[in-house]
Regions:
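Acyl-group transfer acyltransferase/transacylase scaffold of fatty acid/polyketide systems
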Residues: 1-153
Length: 153
């Protein structure tokens, strides 16, 4: 989050940026094995197509806020949440702000849904007092339910 940064683009551009970070004293650089230029303008056409696909869904007030990973803004209607979801495809994300907003919401626990556990690890650094896990930490849905029922410890 605050100490982590992801840079995306063509390999030649990444090499130039990596050299600049090393010269500036970066302590660690990791090349992610990702083939899709997610969260970059290179996917702007995909974002537009996705937004069009989502536009058929009904408008309604949400029963819980949905945070935009772009700027940690809380969407409270379906249309604003779906708009943010589509924009996230081609816009850089600000996980640090998003995780800070989650912390400020004072949840009883946080469960990262999706592949991996990178965000759960980042959140545990930011808010060690809040129990956090990722779905990938569990072998089954029943394990997740047991964790939640046990008070998240």
């Amino acid at each position: 989050a605050p100490r982590h940064l992801v840079v995306a683009g063509p390999r030649t551009g990444i090499a130039v940026v990596a050299a600049q970070f090393e010269a500036a004293g970066a302590s660690r650089l990791v090349h992610l094995a990702v083939q899709t230029p997610s969260h970059t303008p290179l996917l702007s056409q995909a974002a537009l197509a996705f937004k069009k696909r989502l536009s058929v869904l009904p408008e309604r007030r949400l029963s819980f806020p949905v945070l935009s990973a772009i700027d940690a803004t809380a969407a409270r209607t379906a249309s604003s949440a779906l708009d943010a979801l589509a924009r996230q495809i081609s816009t850089p994300l600000n996980w640090a702000s998003c995780l800070q907003t989650v912390r400020e919401m004072q949840p009883d626990a946080v469960l990262e849904i999706g592949p991996g556990n990178a965000l759960a690890r980042l959140f545990s650094e930011l808010a060690p007092e809040i129990p956090v896990r990722a779905t990938d930490d569990f072998r089954s849905c029943e394990g997740i339910v047991r964790w939640l029922e046990a008070g998240n410890r």
